[in-house]
Amino acid sequence: MSEDTRTWAHMLERAKTNNFLGKQLFVVFTYPADGMEPIMENITEHLAYQRMLEDTGVMFAAGPMGDRGGETWSGSGMVVVRAENFAAAEKIAAADPMHASGARNYHVQPWLVNEGTITVKVGFASGSRELD
């Protein structure tokens, strides 16, 4: 192993020994295979699948990714999922109607959440919600 790389197992262990959060998630980067038309044709089924992942606690977060500079959207997105392992995350990604139909291509990468903060504000009566 070169000095510039570490095994993923090493990174997981290092998170534990350094008292980091060490939460392993999987990021699905998804991007158009052939323009926007196939994406729009599959958007309803895709969103239903996303809702199912959310309802079952598989989805951590998801949403579209703006193009560089944030001026436009060309159909790219990111989905962060909870999965037992890489193979399970791949299976979740492959089942997305966007990917199964060929409207989008994707790749999955493991992500180790070590640092950061999150603030959640929920208004019970108003039904408002805020994430910061």
Give, region by region, the residue ranges found by the protein language model.
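Conserved, structured core segments of small domains
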Residues: 1-132
